[in-house]
């Protein structure tokens, strides 16, 4: 692998998670529990993917009680078959993090991104504290309401990335670019019950690949991170100054043009 230091490198990560309670109970919690069992990421430039990694987190994946609570627990036999066929490795979380840190250092990654990046940052922090309780010093930030909440960005930068990467949310970026294009709204427009334009990764990927709605996400970490990388690469080709790269409820940034 040859690294061109003149280029920007991005790590695009996706997680599949479970919890210590059922999905129905978890969604009622003030803060949803997110324990990572499937972690996948790419490292890419604006034109190519140079690294693909996929691991199952040993401490979570091999805990049957936790896996029974996974939203996509019906996929457990599929994962078991992937492990048996050497398509994915089961590793301790600390080892996965070390591999990721080495990849970040060796490629000179500057940006960390995901589609709804806040979810994945929180999942990484929660998983760290679940597997290794009372080890990490927590960071807190003041919210707009004046209360304090865990600072997932500082946590991940300090302990998991070992580098102050710029955080980018592909959902936020897609809403200001691809989802605000006339062709997207003319041919791929779908709305929620509240009348908001749908802007999930599946719809956006169908649009950029002209798949007419025939593509459905696998909801496995590496597969999803690859399509999210393709979305990022398309966004990077658009010459537009973005208002922000990480916003709360980013669908509100979509400009209706049709």
Say what each PLM segment does:
Residues 61-62, 66-83, 158, 163-223:
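Active-site-proximal helix-loop-helix substrate-binding element of RNase H-like nuclease domains
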